[in-house]
A protein has these predicted regions:
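Broad gene-expression machinery/nucleic-acid interaction feature
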Residues: 33-35, 98, 277, 339
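Conserved protein-kinase catalytic-loop segment immediately C-terminal to the catalytic Asp
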Residues: 338, 343-345
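Phosphate/dinucleotide-binding and metal-coordinating scaffold of catalytic cores
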Residues: 83-327, 331-333, 345-462
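Conserved glycine(s) in the ABC-transporter nucleotide-binding domain "signature"
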Residues: 1-89
């Protein structure tokens, strides 16, 4: 590869990962506001820029302009033209994605050379309804290639590829938590043939078990088990359980939030300890419903206001469920809510969106990364994020006021602590949770403007 081709590849990669759009200034009720705006699928999208992020956002927008100018110049050179022609040839020779996209044994889309030519819009996965990008959808279902045990798993399965699409297609892109799968052209397979009925590589995916290399390659749900932590699926008495590795603080945080939600009557995945690991029961009950991460609708934009408006457009009731999730995340200090760890449940037969999925993946919450230094939550970073959201989204604040929010008491906290076999600072947990609840309640009930000047404190005491 020539130096020009290498630089073009570098620029294209950086541009693909860079901020997109332009900065727009608005004056609302006499107050200056700035928004990042861009066009997506023919529609104008907008994201509020917080005061402390404005200069950085401006710099990123200017950086993108500079990259685009350099790329345009390089593509016009002889080496640039040659690189473009080689890339077109590679696309023509890429893996032939031709066949049918299935839901159980029902055809929901026809795919020819990577393009959807016919589809049942009712049942199509949400990501495909929005983008039509079958390659992106397939790639999103593959195991994270950066996990150490992912590489070991592929070696044990004799899978000679680093390509996410090929990895997913090795098991027809099937997963435990939905009934979608890909049927290659000419295949006579039915859903019963491809659905997962066993997993002989669970221990390899979870802990790098060396004995797994002696096993004969077989179908495993680990090739479509996404996420960055080492984990695995185990089939126990006919039910799938997700096992995950971690430390005692991560286990405590996951268990505490699970038990708290259960006692408050909030939808949650069930978690429990099993020896050295924590496990959670498949909340789709063997894909009785289809789970789809919110990334299907918003890509990587986890901004509260953006997600709220997207969900409100589906159903005000689902938007309320999202507000309850944000309430729990804020009170319990979940630092890692992103677009791959919350989502929607859909009816398998009709495609109807039923509800937000239950709360799960709280292993980077509460004290998972140490005891936050601001125990009384007076300058709490996550509550600050909620504050900014409520300031800019009056609809959300009004919905919160209409809702009957749960009430956490000291007795409920003590019950949760008593049921978790992990030693922690009980008084700290009580104070931290109750103060968080009080701060969030104050935000929701407050009538005036919420200050943007407060600097969030994300300090931890380790």
């Amino acid at each position: 590869m020539s130096d020009t081709a290498k630089r073009i590849a570098e620029l294209e990669k950086e541009l693909a990962e860079s901020i997109n759009g332009y900065i727009s200034r608005k004056v609302i009720k006499g107050k200056e506001r700035f928004y990042l705006q861009w066009t997506e699928n023919g529609k104008l999208k907008s994201r509020y820029i917080k005061a402390g992020e404005l200069e950085q956002t401006r710099a990123l927008v200017e950086r993108r302009k500079s990259l685009q100018a350099e790329l345009k110049k390089l593509k016009a050179t002889p080496d640039g033209v040659k690189s473009y022609n080689l890339k077109r040839k590679a696309v023509r020779n890429m893996q032939n994605i031709t066949g049918t996209l299935m839901s159980e044994d029902h055809v929901i889309a026809t795919v020819k050379n990577g393009v959807i030519t016919d589809a049942d819009e009712r049942l199509l996965p949400l990501y495909l309804k929005r983008t039509g990008n079958i390659e992106g959808w397939l790639a999103s279902r593959a195991i994270d290639p950066h996990r150490t045990n992912s590489r070991l798993l592929k070696r044990a399965l004799r899978l000679r590829t680093t390509d996410d699409i090929a990895t997913a297609l090795a098991v027809n892109a099937a997963t435990v938590t939905d009934r979608y799968w890909f049927k290659p052209e000419g295949s006579s397979a039915v859903y019963e043939d491809i659905r997962f009925k066993e997993n002989y590589f669970a221990e390899l995916a979870l802990r790098g078990d060396p004995d797994s290399f002696s096993r004969k390659p077989s179908r495993t749900p680990e090739l479509t088990n996404t996420g960055s932590f080492e984990k695995c699926w185990k089939l126990i008495d006919g039910e799938w359980w997700m096992y995950k590795s971690g430390n005692k603080e991560e286990y405590f945080s996951e268990l505490f939030i699970c038990k708290l939600c259960e006692k408050l009557g909030l939808p949650t995945a069930h978690y429990e300890l099993d020896g050295r690991y924590i496990r959670s029961k498949d909340f789709t009950n063997g894909a009785a419903v289809n789970f789809e991460p919110i990334r299907a609708l918003v890509d990587d934009d986890e901004d509260y206001e953006n997600c709220f408006h997207v969900l409100y457009g589906i159903s005000p009731e689902i938007a309320k469920q999202y507000l309850l999730l944000l309430w729990t995340d804020s009170v319990c200090y979940n630092m890692d809510r992103h677009t791959e760890n919350f989502g929607l449940l859909r009816d398998v037969k009709t495609g109807k969106i039923l509800s937000l999925a239950p709360n799960y993946d709280n292993n980077i919450a509460l004290i998972a990364k140490g005891y936050p230094s601001d125990v009384r939550r007076t300058h709490d970073g996550l509550i600050g994020f909620l504050k900014a959201f409520l300031q800019d989204c009056e609809e959300a604040r009004e919905l919160y006021r209409e809702m009957r929010l749960p009430e956490i008491t000291e007795d409920i906290i003590d019950e949760c602590l008593d049921e978790i076999p992990v030693e922690v600072d009980r008084e700290y947990i009580r104070t931290f949770i109750l103060c968080g609840q009080d701060r969030v309640r104050e935000l929701i009930e407050m009538d005036g403007d919420l200050s943007e000047d407060e600097e969030p404190n994300m300090g931890l005491t380790l």
